[in-house]
Amino acid sequence: MIEQNVDGICILANYSEQFLLSDEERETLTRLCIEHVDGRVPVITTVSHFSTDIALSRAKLVKSLGGDMLMMMPPYHGALMKGSPQQTFEQFAKVGEAGVTIMVQDAPLSGVDLPVPLLVKMAKEIEMVKCFKIECAQAAAKLRQLVNEGREIIEGPFDGEEGITLFADLEAGATGNMSSAMLPDLIRPVVLDFLDGKVEEAESKYNQILPLINYENRQCGFRAAKIIMKEGGVIKSDYCRHPIAPLEDSTREGLIKLASKYNPVALTWGL
């Protein structure tokens, strides 16, 4: 990923299949990734858990290893156990005691509503809460409201969800994007051009790669990056642990065929 020219790397997130890893595997990967990157780019480590104590212990491990940032979803477990706004605030405040910058992940997977006033309150009152990855429905509207109401305390408004809403989110005030590992080398120029005021160039570049982003987001999910990395010799296997099913053959072939038109780094890196 460093040779994809990324500005940072996020580990143990939902697209990292964190929900299929044991506690021991999580700790091993946290150590391995932070040590292997060795300061070349910042590493963001996801520490989400319904238990505040467990999330805090994960944060302390990251701190001890020299990790640069944490990412957290609000506390949830299954479809019905969800932290209240106050409980969510308290969990982020407690994890903030570890002394590592926090990115709040507002993702639909949690099913927890994070209204903008709560996010602004967290940014104002919890020292370590500085960044926000917004990938809920109508993300652009929420980003715009967050930036307008939070102003300078919202240090890092990020787009997510593989960049499927990237251009609208940039127009709304996002200053960064967290994509999958499949094509960050193709997404980065869009963001940089936009932030440099080259809006038409950014829009053109985004429109060119949007079919591949759409195919990943709507047809494949997190399996896309693994398939492309295996095809490109980056990894040996694209196996997904049960109960995740393998991608249907025709969809897999369609992904590889489409990706070959764009030639992302991941498709050739290990060949």
Give short role names for the model-derived ranges.
Residues 2-111, 268-270:
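Active-site beta->alpha loop and helix N-cap motifs at the rims of alpha/beta catalytic domains
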Residues 80-81, 142, 227:
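Flexible glycine/acidic-rich beta-alpha junction loops that bind and position SAM and/or redox cofactors
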Residues 4-6, 171-174, 182, 186-271:
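C-terminal alpha-helical cap/extension of soluble enzyme domains
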Residues 1, 33, 62, 95, ...:
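Conserved, mostly hydrophobic/aromatic
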Residues 3, 35-39, 64, 97, ...:
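Secondary-structure boundary motif
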Residues 108-219:
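Catalytic alpha/beta core domains of metabolic enzymes, predominantly
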